[in-house]
Amino acid sequence: MKTYWQNITNRDNIDRGLYIILPLRYQGFFQSITIDEKDTEFPKLTFDSSDFTELLSVKCRNGNFVKRFSINSRLKETVEAWNGKVAASKEYQLDDLQFFIFNNGIAFITIYLSYQNKDAEKMYQFINPGYVQDKSEDINQIQDALLNSLEEKVFGCIQEKLGVTLSWFTQDEKSKRYIIKEAYRLNIASLPKRFEDNEIPKRIAYNGHRLVDLTRDFRDASEEDVEYATGAKDVDDEHYGWGCAITSQEISYAYGPGPWKSKPRDKKGLRERSEDDLLLTMIVMYQKYTCMIFNEKIHQRFTSEERRLKGEASLRDLKREALEFISYGTLAPSQISRWNNVCETYRSLQKQNGVNEALEEISQKITLLNEEQDRIDGERESRVSMIITAFGLISIIAAALQTLDYISTGNSLMIAGFLVTCVAMILFFLALRFDEIRRRRKQKDR
């Protein structure tokens, strides 16, 4: 680390940025969302990456899986509302707003805060990673004001333009205060030069994850769940171009200049460089929150009396949705990208966000749903059998009464026929019984 930073001046001015990915629910029809290609208020952005396989690119480009929009037309109004509510928010620079909407009721707003290395402490105070309670009430007010400004300036506009009603992905109003705290983050930094050793970008990316000065030699032995990925070494200049640290709270990238480039990326170039990594992260966020929705639906199915009364139809629909998501909504790492390091980054993102564990849990709960389906089918068959038995008993009683009516006439031929029939039936059932006993004895002798 010390060798890397030798002869580097203006370390305080290293450009950094932070995407905060805010989860949402929406009500409305995904397929009915249409925006004119020339619309300047809500321009549609392409959800595609050169890192993706063609299979994934086609799925994302056709608009049936995800749609992406720039909502920077509301950026100025949102910032003004934020600053008007809390003056201390002027310390933070909000540079970009995007809206991602998926086809299953989940959506995201990404807010991008740009800052420099010298402002790392300020950003650390804003996020306060690793702590439930913030160090000051001012930070809570800044966060609440940001969320309220988005509700006022963005939510209504999205409803008007896209026809969907948004709400935060929370259980109740009280948990709204934890939205920013629990939101996944993408942290990025533009480094002044490329890396001779791939341990260097890992260390710098870890500092980015902890929201501290990138030049610090910072270590934390207690954080054992961090995973890393780096770009391949360039065969010409024999240097590495990037590295990332992946945790359950965020993914942090350290980008060096391009091959044979001596100048770091500027603010605009930094955001452009992070474009592919943002889209990769969004795919995992879609999987994470979809798993949460299915677990929620399954829980409600077994606890809500109203849903229980809906019975077989709702259960069948829930199973179908869950199986479709497991079959088509998720992709193995090898199907994500043609590049091994991107596949490994995706694999680590899935692992750290608990996607694979959640999928396994959903699969186990589908087994419970199958048992519930069998129980419902058994109850229905029992009801049908009871109805058939009841009609059978009624028929037998009616036949017996009719027979007694015939016998009561005193006709000797009728009485004799009835007795012969009864004796024949008794002999028939005795013969069946003796035959069954004989077969059992033969089986025992063998």
What positions do the PLM features span?
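Membrane-proximal, solvent-exposed terminal domains/tails of membrane-associated proteins
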Residues: 184, 189-339
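Alpha-helical transmembrane anchor segments
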Residues: 385-446
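Membrane-associated alpha-helical segments
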Residues: 282-402
